[in-house]
Amino acid sequence: MNYFISFVINYLTIMLSEEKLSGLIITYNEEKNIAEVLECFDFCDEIIIVDSFSTDKTLEIARTCPKVKVIQHPFHNFTEQRNIALEHAKNDWVLFLDGDERITPELKTEIIETLHSQHSKDAYYFYRKFFFERRAIYFSGTQNDKNFRLFRKSKAKYVADKKVHETLDIKENIGVLKNKLLHYSVSDIESYRKKMIHYG
């Protein structure tokens, strides 16, 4: 069975199941990314965007998708924005993505199968494959990078005292998905320089 047929079957399964999924993202001036992120969320029951008053076309593009619900909130820190998204999600299962992250068809299928497994955990780590200028990065120390992206919001919350690289507070029943999330972390040299200055 090829991936397309498998995905269609799994997609129909999730639509008929009680297990629904909310796709969550926080944004500020993500017009270059938002359309692709929304495509990654196409199997979600709803999409929650917490936006920090973008000045570009982020929201104009986002509102073309009928599943999208936009909440505008001033940016204080990443932890607060993510927890606001959790508060507005109507489903227990949530999938968080950043603007520079993408889901492969294989990962999407694995997520759907995980939601319907009788042995599903409460939270799942995603390993990430990093890209620089759309080219995959190897041997850079990023091979073991992983983050929580799929979890039950009833079992977890972002720790409030973490301002950057926020931490999900969950104690046990944790799993890891085998397919990697694509992370287009740096688009060019100038973006890399600005990122290092900002987080340095």
Question: Which functions belong to the PLM regions below?
Answer:
Residues K20-S22:
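Cell-envelope/extracellular polymer assembly enzymes that use nucleotide-activated donors
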Residues C40, D51-E60, D98:
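A conserved acidic beta->alpha catalytic loop
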Residues S52, H73-F75, N91, D98-E101, ...:
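Short acidic donor-binding/metal-coordinating loop in glycosyltransferase active sites
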Residues I25-F43:
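Short, well-formed alpha-helical segments that are part of the catalytic scaffolds
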Residues E80-L86, W93, T104-G200:
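Catalytic-site signature of metal-activated, phosphate-bearing donor transferases
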Residues L59-H88:
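Conserved donor nucleotide-binding strand/loop of the catalytic core
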